[in-house]
Amino acid sequence: MAYPDFTLENKLSGVIAGVDEVGRGPLAGPVMSAAVVFTNRNIIIEGINDSKKLTAKNRQVLYEKIISVAKFGIGMASVAEINSYNILQATKLSMERALVNLGIELDYVLVDGNQPPKVKWQVKSIVKGDSLSVSVAAASIVAKVARDQLMQELHNQYPEYNWYKNKGYGTKGHIDAINLYGVTEHHRKSFAPILNSTKRALL
């Protein structure tokens, strides 16, 4: 398996943050982003990769290591904001908040994908950035673990939706629960499956 490295970071100068998001596709819960800066790139954490390629256990271990040596910020856009704007704009908003919460001045921002937020720093968009840049991959891990922890908390409020397992994604079990129990304030009512369920409930 190929792992990301600091090649992209080393081509640039100054303080560089990697940014990634998680939770664009789920039917419930916020979208979250993380920004990570490795001020010392000589520190090597083995195993850092795109969070989707890691097990939950490995993500947790790497998360603890990352936050112990790197500076990080986490940003969130709420379900209300997703419904009011759209998921793309809400995602950018969560990225902007993650960078603000990082709390340091930057020279460059490396963003996974091709839809970067509008920020005051120079931004470089990288398709599959979480497979190329250690900073972006680390951000994907921090964002994923943070969101999973939040979905566990929301699951404790509404256990019938199994959010601890599906993380709000539109699994068959989640859709069945929506049809049986209805939608909550944590569901994205602007998303088609939720919108259709709400319309059926009003018939």
Curated annotation (Swiss-Prot):
<keyword id="KW-0479">Metal-binding</keyword>
<dbReference type="InterPro" id="IPR036397">
    <property type="entry name" value="RNaseH_sf"/>
</dbReference>
<comment type="function">
    <text>Endonuclease that specifically degrades the RNA of RNA-DNA hybrids.</text>
</comment>
<dbReference type="InterPro" id="IPR012337">
    <property type="entry name" value="RNaseH-like_sf"/>
</dbReference>
<dbReference type="GO" id="GO:0006298">
    <property type="term" value="P:mismatch repair"/>
</dbReference>
<dbReference type="GO" id="GO:0004523">
    <property type="term" value="F:RNA-DNA hybrid ribonuclease activity"/>
</dbReference>
<keyword id="KW-0378">Hydrolase</keyword>
<dbReference type="Pfam" id="PF01351">
    <property type="entry name" value="RNase_HII"/>
</dbReference>
<dbReference type="GO" id="GO:0032299">
    <property type="term" value="C:ribonuclease H2 complex"/>
</dbReference>
<dbReference type="InterPro" id="IPR022898">
    <property type="entry name" value="RNase_HII"/>
</dbReference>
<feature type="binding site">
    <location>
        <position position="112"/>
    </location>
    <ligand>
        <name>a divalent metal cation</name>
    </ligand>
</feature>
<dbReference type="GO" id="GO:0003723">
    <property type="term" value="F:RNA binding"/>
</dbReference>
<feature type="domain" description="RNase H type-2">
    <location>
        <begin position="14"/>
        <end position="203"/>
    </location>
</feature>
<feature type="binding site">
    <location>
        <position position="20"/>
    </location>
    <ligand>
        <name>a divalent metal cation</name>
    </ligand>
</feature>
<feature type="binding site">
    <location>
        <position position="21"/>
    </location>
    <ligand>
        <name>a divalent metal cation</name>
    </ligand>
</feature>
<keyword id="KW-0464">Manganese</keyword>
<dbReference type="GO" id="GO:0005737">
    <property type="term" value="C:cytoplasm"/>
</dbReference>
<dbReference type="InterPro" id="IPR001352">
    <property type="entry name" value="RNase_HII/HIII"/>
</dbReference>
<keyword id="KW-0540">Nuclease</keyword>
<comment type="similarity">
    <text>Belongs to the RNase HII family.</text>
</comment>
<dbReference type="GO" id="GO:0043137">
    <property type="term" value="P:DNA replication, removal of RNA primer"/>
</dbReference>
<dbReference type="InterPro" id="IPR024567">
    <property type="entry name" value="RNase_HII/HIII_dom"/>
</dbReference>
<dbReference type="GO" id="GO:0030145">
    <property type="term" value="F:manganese ion binding"/>
</dbReference>
<keyword id="KW-0963">Cytoplasm</keyword>
<keyword id="KW-0255">Endonuclease</keyword>
<protein>
    <recommendedName>
        <fullName>Ribonuclease HII</fullName>
        <ecNumber>3.1.26.4</ecNumber>
    </recommendedName>
</protein>
